[in-house]
Amino acid sequence: MTLGQFGGLFCIYLIAVIFILTLTYQEFRRVKFNFNVLFSMLYLLTFYFGFPLTCMLVFQFGVAVVPVEYLLYAMLSATAFYGIYYVTYKTRLRQPRSQPRTPIFTMNRVETNLTWVLLALVAVGTVGIFFMQNGFLLFKLDSYSKIFSSDVSGVALKRFFYFFIPAMLVVYFLKQDRRAWFFFLASTVAFGILTYVIVGGTRANIIIAFSLFLFIGIVRGWITLWMLAAAGVFGIVGMFWLALKRYGLDVNGAEAFYTFLYLTRDTFSPWENLGLLLQNYDKIDFQGLAPIVRDFYVFIPSALWPERPDLVLNTANYFTWDVLDNHSGLAISPTLIGSLVVMGGVLFIPLGAIVVGLIIKWFDWLYEQGKAESNRYKAAILQSFCFGAVFNIIVLAREGLDSFVSRVVFFCVIFGACLVLAKLLYWLFDTAGLIKRQGIKSNRLSTPNAGNQL
């Protein structure tokens, strides 16, 4: 990359960042937090945060990067995608209802407490089973990629660990004070550190717990933008330190700065992967919607499907194995736009932007229903579900649409199963005479707002 090429890229970069930041800041001033603001921040992080890091790697350390024209295509496609997404998100599809909706379900105190207990048991129970099978992998494995090898059993259990976070979200939303806020941070980060040590370097639970703590603080007005920026810097440094421990790296001086740049870029902003994918566009055999279906394979037990493929060919694995011919053991993220390109080429980019706009619009509708709900137990469940889905939104921006669909369906199934089981247990306890009727009557006095019922 020459200085002239850098100047041209920087102009496009500046226009794109100002465009997205302006729209995001206007939305932030209007509502403080919603899923459009969240997705926009994640989108900026994924596709634009890495550009300065890439430039420092190129000019400070002489690192070879994707040809500039493909980086330009990546930046332009990301900007066009966001424009189409934003128009879709802001388009009103129907007029507001004048008639009240019939509520799909209601909640009381016992059912709500049973729900978060069941969610926590799912997480703690699967962590315990994984630990009994593998021990502390952080101290046993000499390479992070071996987490996905046949030496590690029960890998599918890792998907259940995350449900500790929505469990603690229910606890927070029942109280919604500073004490509950800090309890959420302490409990979820402690659980995240435990899973980091047991699994051998998976940082997702720690990142999500800290991010949700900040988002809640923004919503409640307990955190300012300056505090958020400082927390972001702390989070980046913390994730870098955890990455060093995960990969067993011992660096200092210029090497430490170089390692910080490329690990931070790869962790938070794999935007160069999109340029790399576009560079190899002629090698892609468009997969259609098959990667979405294939990503569900991991949820099917081998006992039910003995011929189930051990390796799932989703868009990330297709990009890594078939396009790049990379078989190092770790999948290279194609990003949201890259996953659309793998599925249907550049024509899928505007279609994907429309789909994503509708997805974020639905999450915001559900979140608003939760905030407006007068039954505080039902409100806690709805808001916990929405905030608990933040991890899926991160997966959407960073990993792709296929990974998002499988994970959000899995999240809905497990969350819904715990909710239904909680109601069933409540019915059994009530039938057995274990429920105090006075408490039930007082809870039923809190009826949902007729204009905001689900």
Swiss-Prot record:
<feature type="transmembrane region" description="Helical">
    <location>
        <begin position="61"/>
        <end position="81"/>
    </location>
</feature>
<dbReference type="Pfam" id="PF06899">
    <property type="entry name" value="WzyE"/>
</dbReference>
<feature type="transmembrane region" description="Helical">
    <location>
        <begin position="222"/>
        <end position="242"/>
    </location>
</feature>
<comment type="similarity">
    <text>Belongs to the WzyE family.</text>
</comment>
<feature type="transmembrane region" description="Helical">
    <location>
        <begin position="180"/>
        <end position="200"/>
    </location>
</feature>
<dbReference type="GO" id="GO:0005886">
    <property type="term" value="C:plasma membrane"/>
</dbReference>
<feature type="transmembrane region" description="Helical">
    <location>
        <begin position="377"/>
        <end position="397"/>
    </location>
</feature>
<feature type="transmembrane region" description="Helical">
    <location>
        <begin position="39"/>
        <end position="59"/>
    </location>
</feature>
<feature type="transmembrane region" description="Helical">
    <location>
        <begin position="340"/>
        <end position="360"/>
    </location>
</feature>
<keyword id="KW-0812">Transmembrane</keyword>
<feature type="transmembrane region" description="Helical">
    <location>
        <begin position="119"/>
        <end position="139"/>
    </location>
</feature>
<dbReference type="GO" id="GO:0009246">
    <property type="term" value="P:enterobacterial common antigen biosynthetic process"/>
</dbReference>
<feature type="transmembrane region" description="Helical">
    <location>
        <begin position="3"/>
        <end position="23"/>
    </location>
</feature>
<feature type="transmembrane region" description="Helical">
    <location>
        <begin position="201"/>
        <end position="221"/>
    </location>
</feature>
<keyword id="KW-0472">Membrane</keyword>
<keyword id="KW-0997">Cell inner membrane</keyword>
<feature type="transmembrane region" description="Helical">
    <location>
        <begin position="154"/>
        <end position="174"/>
    </location>
</feature>
<comment type="subunit">
    <text>Probably part of a complex composed of WzxE, WzyE and WzzE.</text>
</comment>
<dbReference type="InterPro" id="IPR010691">
    <property type="entry name" value="WzyE"/>
</dbReference>
<protein>
    <recommendedName>
        <fullName>Probable ECA polymerase</fullName>
    </recommendedName>
</protein>
<keyword id="KW-1133">Transmembrane helix</keyword>
<feature type="transmembrane region" description="Helical">
    <location>
        <begin position="409"/>
        <end position="429"/>
    </location>
</feature>
<comment type="pathway">
    <text>Bacterial outer membrane biogenesis; enterobacterial common antigen biosynthesis.</text>
</comment>
<comment type="function">
    <text>Probably involved in the polymerization of enterobacterial common antigen (ECA) trisaccharide repeat units.</text>
</comment>
<keyword id="KW-1003">Cell membrane</keyword>
